[in-house]
Every structure is written in C-alpha cells, then in structure tokens.
Regions:
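Glycine-rich phosphate-binding loop signature in dinucleotide/nucleotide-binding domains
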Residues: 51-54, 116-124
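Domain-level recognition of soluble alpha/beta enzyme cores
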Residues: 146-171
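Conserved histidine-centered catalytic loops in small-molecule metabolism enzymes
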Residues: 53-81, 163-192
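GST superfamily/GST-like fold recognition
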Residues: 132-136, 171
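Active-site-proximal alpha-helix that buttresses catalytic centers in soluble enzyme cores
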Residues: 2-76, 97
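Generic beta-sheet signal
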Residues: 10, 56, 122-132
Length: 192
C-alpha cells in the first residue's frame, strides 16, 4: 500500500442492551430508552476493547443509549443525527417516531458512508456507535449490497469492522463480533 492511497478502518458498534430490547413493565421513554444495567456492563466491555486504539474519530447517534455506549470509548465524540435509528428523528423537544422506509434509511446510510469516506482518507480509524436497524442498512451500504437483498443481525454491543482501500475491494474484516462480552453475556445476545 502506498502512503498516498486512502485507507480507512471503519468500526461499527451497536449500543448496549436498552430498555427497549427487553420485556419489562417498567415505564421508559419508548423513543429514547436508556441502557439497562446489563447494557451498561456491555458498554464498559466495548470501551475496554477499544482502550488500546489510540488514534480514532468517534461518531455517535444523539440518542442516549448510543451516546452512553460511545462515552465508554471516549468522551470526545461527534454527535451526528444521520446516525439515528430507523424511524426516529430529532426535534426541538427531543426525539419522535416517524415513518421512514427501509429505502429511505438505506439512502441515509449511503450518505453517511460517503461523508465518512470523503472526510477520513489517510490511514484513519473511525468508530460509529448507532442502532441495530440503521447499522443493518449502513453495513449493506458500505459493502454495496442492495437495500432489500438481505437482513443482517446486529447484536447489542457488537463490533463490525469494514476496511476501505483505494486499490482493493471493500473488505468485511469482522462481523457482529461479541468476543469482548464473554464475561458479561454468556449466551444472552439480542439482535435486530
């Protein structure tokens, strides 16, 4: 690889388990559910996994469960409303549900990939913390898989790594990895 060619390692992380991922009678904000105690342990494990990665740019969805997960990696992060979950939008008063088709979500994911690839070109590590349904579309967009071709499982607190290089095809280097959760999860995985 030449020094002048673009090389980007993109890490995609789904937030830890949230109240919206479990069955509960406890009241919570359905649009912006907080992490469960288990989700907080998962977020901590994600932070520990990335502790050795010294140079990176961290992006997070503005929703609390993603920001809380991202904050375990670094307190310095870029909040990007394009990373919101499918069917959620930011308003002056917080967040609200609205209809967003899979195709519209995929178009938003393509926009995010284009933005990241144009902004981060020189041997960079970029970490995105977001949501299951959006990451499903983002992974497909990054790999040039059409929107409706397949549905991917994205576990809570999982890591997917995609490498971009000027002179090679996009590489799915790691998919839905939860090896850092062995202490916290055992067999308990939630996907969407």
């Amino acid at each position: 690889m030449r020094n002048d060619e673009m090389y980007l390692q993109l890490y995609l992380i789904r937030h830890g388990e949230s109240m919206g991922n479990i069955e509960t009678d406890e009241p919570f904000d359905k649009t912006n559910p907080p992490l469960t105690p288990h989700g907080k342990m998962q977020a901590k494990a994600v932070g520990e996994r990335f502790a050795e990665l010294k140079e990176f740019t961290l992006y997070s969805s503005p929703l609390g469960r993603a920001r809380e997960t991202a904050s375990q990696i670094s307190t310095e992060m870029i909040i990007d409303s394009d990373l919101l979950e499918n069917g959620v939008r930011a308003t002056e008063n917080g967040f609200e549900d609205y209809y967003e088709s899979a195709e519209e979500c995929y178009a938003r994911a393509l926009k995010v990939i284009g933005k990241i690839r144009s902004k981060h070109r020189n041997h960079e590590n970029v970490i995105i913390v977001a949501h299951g349904m959006f990451l499903n579309q983002l992974i497909k967009a990054a790999l040039n898989i059409p929107c409706g071709a397949m549905r991917l499982s994205v576990y809570n607190a999982s890591v997917t790594k995609i490498n971009f290089c000027d002179d090679a095809p996009v590489k799915l280097a790691l998919s839905n990895d939860v090896s850092h959760l062995k202490e916290t999860d055992g067999e308990k995985l939630f996907w969407m």
